[in-house]
Amino acid sequence: MYVLFSYRLSREMKNKTPLVYLQQYAVAAFIALFIFAYGKPVQSQIISTPGYEVLAAPDLWYNDVDGVRVGVRLRGQQPGTFLDGPNRVDFGLWLGTNLPTHPVSYYLRYVEPIPGITDFGSEGSFNLFTSIREGLHNHGVGIEKRWQPGFNEFVYSEASAYLSTHYRFDDEYTHFPLLWQDEVVVRALGRFERQNDNALGFFNLNTSLTVGLPMDTDFFSQFQASYQQEIVIAQNFTLNGRLFAVTATDYLPTEYYHQTAMAPALDWTVSGFTRSRGTIPNAWMDNGNVHVAGGANLRGYTAQNIEAALEGEPMLYSNIGAVNLELRYPNPLDNVLRDIPILGDFLRLNSYLFYDMGAPFDYEEGFDQTLSDAGAGFMLSLNIPDYVGRQRGFNFRYDIPFWLSDPATDEDAFEFRSLFSIGAVIAL
C-alpha cells in the first residue's frame, strides 16, 4: 500500500497537481511544530524523553539549482541503544536559498528490527524510506538481513528485498538530462552480498536483480554481479581483482543503462557529491576530469563518455562485462597517517597500479570492441563502520590512466591524463 501511494504521489507530481507541494510544506510545518513543542534549539543538541531521544544537527550543502541548501538532520532512537534498537529514524529537511521551483526537500528512513531474525551483529530489519529532493521522487519499503559471525565486521553476508518507486520530475538538477527518462518506475529489487576470506585473501561477491513492474514503464529486468578477490603477494603488496557483468532485457529505463567508464545515472543519486550538478564544479565534469566509480569502470574512457553525453549521443549499454586489476604497493605517507591518534584507525592513503579491460556484448553477435586502459593512482579513504560493522565513509581517488587501447582521434595511446574519482569499485 505504501509503495502504491508513493507511485500515485509520483504520478501527481508528473501531472503537476498541488499535492506534492502540500506534502512538502506539511513536512516543514511538522518539524517546526516539533521543535517548538520541545522548546530547544536545533544545534547538535539532544532532545529526549524517558523513552525516546532525537539527536539534531544543522546541515548545509550546495548545488546550482538550490544554491546553498540549509537544513536540519534528526536521528531518533531509544536512549542507550546506539542505533541498534527499535524505532530508528533518520530524517532531513532542507530549504534551497535560491528558492527554486521546489525549494523544500526532505529525506526520511525508518528502521525497525525484527526480533525473530535478529541477533547480536546479525540484525534483520524492516525498512521504509521516502524522499523528495534534488528533482527526484524516491520511495520504498523492504527487509534487510545481515549475518556476522563474532566480532569481525569484515566477514559477513547480507540479503535484502525492496519494493520501490522513483521518478525524475526536474531535469534541471541532473548533470546529463539525456541519461534519464521521464516515466515513473516501480520495481522489485533483491540483493545478496557475501564477504569472507579464502586461501588467497579476502573476497567479496555482490549480486542484484531488478524487476521493473509494468505500470508507466514496460516490464524489464536487470541482473548484475561482481566478484572481488584480494591476493596477498608479499608484505604490503597485494593484487586486487574484480570481475563485473551486467545484463538486461528490453525496455530498460535510460537511467539503468551502463557506460564503459562510469556508474549508471541512477547510482549517481546515492552520493551527495554527484546527485546534483554544481556540487562538483560543472567545468570539471564537462571536461572529463571527474570519474564516478561503478559499472565496468574503464576509468580511462571517462572523457569519451562525457563528451558523447554532451553531444547528445551517450554511449549506453544494457550488457557489458569487465575485469579490473589493482596492484597496491607501499606508500610512506600511509604510514604517517596510521600514526595519527584515533584518526589513524580510519584514514588510509593507498597507492596502486591499475589495469581495466571490458567490452559490451550481445547474445547473438558476441562481444563488441574490447577496450582497456592502464595507469597509476592514489586513493584516500575514510571508513568508520556503522553499528553493525558495515563500511561507511568515502573514497577519493586521483587516477592517471596514461595508456588507452582506443584513444580519441586527437589523442595518443600513451598520454598524460588525470582524473579525480568519486567512490571505488575495489574496496577490499
Task: Go through the PLM ranges and name each one.
Residues 375-378, 416-428:
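Outer-membrane beta-barrel "beta-signal"
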Residues 101-106, 138-144, 156, 169-178, ...:
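Outer-membrane beta-barrel translocator domains and adjoining extracellular loop/strand segments
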Residues 57-60, 120, 127-129, 186-193, ...:
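C-terminal outer-membrane beta-barrel translocator/porin domains of Gram-negative envelope proteins
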Residues 58, 72, 86-93, 121-130, ...:
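Membrane-embedded beta-strand positions of outer-membrane beta-barrel proteins
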Residues 1-48, 428:
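Bacterial Sec-dependent N-terminal signal peptides
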Residues 44-118, 145-153, 172-201, 293-298, ...:
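Outer-membrane beta-barrel initiation region
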Residues 60-66, 76-78, 93-99, 112-114, ...:
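Transmembrane beta-strands of outer-membrane beta-barrel pores
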Residues 46-53, 80-87, 115-124, 149-158, ...:
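Short loop/turn motifs that connect adjacent beta-strands in outer-membrane beta-barrel proteins
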